[in-house]
Curated annotation (Swiss-Prot):
Membrane-spanning residues: 23-43
Keywords on record: Host endoplasmic reticulum, Host membrane, Membrane, Transmembrane, Transmembrane helix
Transmembrane helix among keywords: yes
Lineage: Viruses, Riboviria, Orthornavirae, Kitrinoviricota, Alsuviricetes
Membrane topology (UniProt): Single-pass membrane protein
Protein's recorded name: Suppressor of RNA silencing
Disulfide bonds: none
Family named by the database record: Belongs to the virgaviridae suppressor of RNA silencing family.
The keyword Repressor is assigned to this record: no
Protein role: Suppressor of RNA-mediated gene silencing, also known as post-transcriptional gene silencing (PTGS), a mechanism of plant viral defense that performs sequence-specific inhibition of viral mRNAs expression. The RNA silencing suppression activity is variable depending on the origin of the isolate.
Cellular compartments annotated: Host endoplasmic reticulum membrane
Length: 68
């Protein structure tokens, strides 16, 4: 049960999205991209491959819209 919770946390892109959103008001876009890359690596090392791709693409699209 505990392991399932940890895997679910790694799979969700919610953590990365919220963290990047909170940083947007404090720092520049480059810092946010670096933070998201770190999250992407962490999720990449987990066992959930579909969610890591979807989450990373979602955050990248979100950052792309903000930069335009």
């Amino acid at each position: 049960m505990e392991r399932r919770f940890i895997v679910y946390y790694n799979c969700s892109d919610c953590a990365c999205g919220r963290y990047v959103s909170s940083l947007l008001t404090m720092s520049g876009a480059y810092v946010n991209v670096c933070v998201c890359i770190v999250f992407f690596i962490l999720v990449y090392l987990s066992s959930c491959y579909n969610m890591r791709v979807l989450g990373f693409l979602r955050v990248c699209i979100y950052l792309y819209k903000l930069c335009r």
